[in-house]
Amino acid sequence: MYPSIDELDIVPARAVIHDAFEEHITQAPGMEHIGEVVNGRILPTPGAVLIAAERLAGEVGDLVVVDVGGATTDVHSITDGSPEVAALSIEPQPHSKRTVEGDLGTYVSAAHVVEMLAEQERPVHLPPPLPTTRAEIEAALTLTHFAAVTGVQRHAGQLAHLYTPTGRQTVARGRDLTACRLVIGTGGALTRLPGGAAILADTRSKGGGERLLPPAVARCVLDRDYIFACCGALFAHFTADAVLALMRRSAGV
């Protein structure tokens, strides 16, 4: 991953991880017959969404994709950051990056999200997997909002201050999202509950903080057809233009 000092090359490692996943997923409970019904590569959902995000960024520019799922919240960013922050950076970052938060989900890990909200004195009842009543939907939205905002906060880097013999020095650590002018939401929670775009709006910077979040002017849209993960897999079998057309229509970009 580090061929030389300050040179970060994660693409080969990512390919090896995908190969290992494809080899071992067929040994997981309930997945032993997947090879009988799939005649192509088996991609993990986060990997497929990252492929889709990379291809779309090539068309529309720097972006963030937030995928709030039942078990995890995955945040993908395709950006080199802003020149201003790059001048302060003290560590290399890849052009495309994904973080997977295993404690932020709206189904498998929902109880833990409820516990974290309670610690912040924001009590909420655990909603059912498919909320139907107004109270259940509001509870699910609270969990989704917390997962999305917390996931992006964890994904983003921040400014820090070091004290040196020559005085205080400001540096940038971690991922710089300040050049991302597009935030896209995917996953069942954001795309099927009402108010997904409004939740994404709260992942943006409100100004004045040291966290390197997407700017307040970033456009927030949804993968309305919930197809980004599928499209990531489709790039291996169909022309890029055709798959990108599906993605752009779904997100309205």
Show where each model-derived region lies:
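Gly/Thr-rich phosphate-binding beta-strand-loop-beta motif of the actin/hexokinase/Hsp70
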Residues: 56-82
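Active-site proximal loops enriched in glycine and acidic residues that flank catalytic Cys/His/Asp
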Residues: 67-70, 77-79, 108, 152, ...
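A generic structural signal for short, solvent-exposed coil/turn residues
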Residues: 67, 96-98, 177
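A glycine- and small-aliphatic-rich helix-loop capping segment at beta-alpha/alpha-beta transitions
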Residues: 79-91, 200-207
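Flexible loop/turn segments at secondary-structure boundaries
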Residues: 71-75, 82-84, 113-114, 191-193
